[in-house]
Amino acid sequence: MAEELVLERCDLELETNGRDHHTADLCREKLVVRRGQPFWLTLHFEGRNYEASVDSLTFSVVTGPAPSQEAGTKARFPLRDAVEEGDWTATVVDQQDCTLSLQLTTPANAPIGLYRLSLEASTGYQGSSFVLGHFILLFNAWCPADAVYLDSEEERQEYVLTQQGFIYQGSAKFIKNIPWNFGQFEDGILDICLILLDVNPKFLKNAGRDCSRRSSPVYVGRVVSGMVNCNDDQGVLLGRWDNNYGDGVSPMSWIGSVDILRRWKNHGCQRVKYGQCWVFAAVACTVLRCLGIPTRVVTNYNSAHDQNSNLLIEYFRNEFGEIQGDKSEMIWNFHCWVESWMTRPDLQPGYEGWQALDPTPQEKSEGTYCCGPVPVRAIKEGDLSTKYDAPFVFAEVNADVVDWIQQDDGSVHKSINRSLIVGLKISTKSVGRDEREDITHTYKYPEGSSEEREAFTRANHLNKLAEKEETGMAMRIRVGQSMNMGSDFDVFAHITNNTAEEYVCRLLLCARTVSYNGILGPECGTKYLLNLNLEPFSEKSVPLCILYEKYRDCLTESNLIKVRALLVEPVINSYLLAERDLYLENPEIKIRILGEPKQKRKLVAEVSLQNPLPVALEGCTFTVEGAGLTEEQKTVEIPDPVEAGEEVKVRMDLLPLHMGLHKLVVNFESDKLKAVKGFRNVIIGPA
């Protein structure tokens, strides 16, 4: 009888598998592979090698605390001669001396997560069991049988592997790109993402069922959407919008997801203070990309928050055009969410592809603060019965806005506001380029088209189908020149009279600081004209000067000012309203890289900024981070005030660990100039 087969060790071939599975950055200490794709391992035996005629090898894999074959979280499979599609299989690749090289293949619909791999070896009546090791299984955008399969290599690189990008802020008229370090392959982030799944309420309620359902990107996406906010659970971020961030970090100060996720884990899964929509979206993007789901951050300008699902935002204003009463239904200057790419076997054909997920806690969905995934295609078609949360997302990009003006005598008049259109310039980063891609057409048909009317009819969007009133008068807000932080500038109410009548009107022109979610701050400029003559077929521009001394103490970190013009013709009771959000441009952060950018060789980043304000800056700090360039955030404090017009400059050491293209992201903070962002692309060559 042959002697017992004894395993000496198992080599999980981290380098080879990491390269083949696009997980090299994750495979430095553990095996991380993607489902539906073979991976390799080598068994080293003592004394003799495996003999097919006398030895039997059976492998087992388990995941989760309560594995079962029925749930798909446990499998036993023998060594086979060939791969069986859709099943766990192990086949021999090579055999030499006392080593056996194997190929293991996982099903393309296996649950993702941490697995234990074991071997049962038997020779005759003798048998032994060995734990070969652990591996983490991810979704696989490279596998055609996987629900997250993307057929474009460029898109797979961008939406799964790229660790840096941009998030778009500002306003629809002045779109501002904010650099962000997603860092999904940075040390410890994958483990944190798995912890996030393991503390979600569905896992705590029924761990076996939760682990089984991790085979579905729809399910995982919905869990992540709920876990990025902390409103119902041990989620990552606490949202705050009142500009009081003293006991945490201002949402505008973050420059990456890595620091946020590490803080959450290091403090026992306690919420991190504070987040707003783009921070929630960016952290969700990091987690989903890390787990293998192609994901991108999306910004919608003039985004509606419709609480009662009537697709209508009604503003009740006083005679000066100021919003009165309940402000819960608002138009946000911009709002960010994520889109993830996946099939939807739970829905009708045609709804695969990009799915919208919104982790910002706004409304409950099935009892939890989460939103989506909902097919972007369903939003475009007005199919509001589609899972999940289609009416809310449809309203964000399509809600109608009605303004009512109430006079002192109690009478209410409908105002015409042509300046506020919901769902503009829906934006995401372009594939492979540091540019913005406009994806509005994926959410909406062209305005006025027959397809748009069909979608609105399907959604029962009666307000949008109604004919718009025309008065022969038009008004819009114009700006004279670029608006830089610290400067004085002019804005104009530009009025056009397209009728043969002469009118004498009242004009109120007002500027107020505003948060990105539409909450107004103090006035920073106003003009009231009681008798404005508008001659037939004429145009007139009325200027308003906005002074730095008026807005400096009340501007939020969003750098936004809302200008409102209300034109009233009292004889015919005509009310015309125009609004525009102005974004004040921060100064440029200049970044120089000193030294030859090579792997594992020290580099120096020289970072500088010129104070654009007419006053000194105090409490100045620079913070930098970049996946592959820094192991953690680096912060330098400036001890002395930076006088008006003066340049402040610091140097920081970097140690790039990985070759290729990286982004160094910088944030500048001070007492009067906050959340100034900058970035520099750095290409690291081989050592």
Swiss-Prot record:
It is linked to TGM2 constitutes the major autoantigen in celiac disease, a multifactorial chronic disorder of the small intestine caused by intolerance to gluten. Celiac disease is characterized by immune-mediated enteropathy associated with failed intestinal absorption and malnutrition: intestinal inflammation is precipitated by ingestion of the protein gliadin, a component of wheat gluten in the diet. TGM2 is the main target for celiac disease-associated anti-endomysium autoantibodies. SUPFAM superfamilies: Cysteine proteinases, E set domains, Transglutaminase, two C-terminal domains. Changing residue 516 to L: No effect on isopeptidase and transamidase activities. Changing residue 278 to L: Abolished isopeptidase and transamidase activities. Acyltransferase activity is regulated by the binding of GTP and Ca(2+): inactivated by GTP, which stabilizes its closed structure, thereby obstructing the accessibility of substrates to the active sites. In contrast, Ca(2+) acts as a cofactor by inducing conformational change to the active open form. In absence of Ca(2+), Mg(2+) may bind Ca(2+)-binding sites, promoting GTP-binding and subsequent inhibition of the acyltransferase activity. Extracellularly reduced and activated by CLIC3. Induction: By retinoic acid. Ca(2+) binds at residues 398, 400, 437, 447, 452, 539. Disulfide bonds join 230-370, 370-371. This is Protein-glutamine gamma-glutamyltransferase 2. The gene is TGM2. Monomer. Interacts with phospholipase C; promoting alpha-1 adrenergic receptor signaling. Interacts with PLCD1. The keyword Mitochondrion applies. There is a cross-link at residue 633 (Isoglutamyl lysine isopeptide (Gln-Lys) (interchain with K-?)). The keyword Transmembrane does not apply.
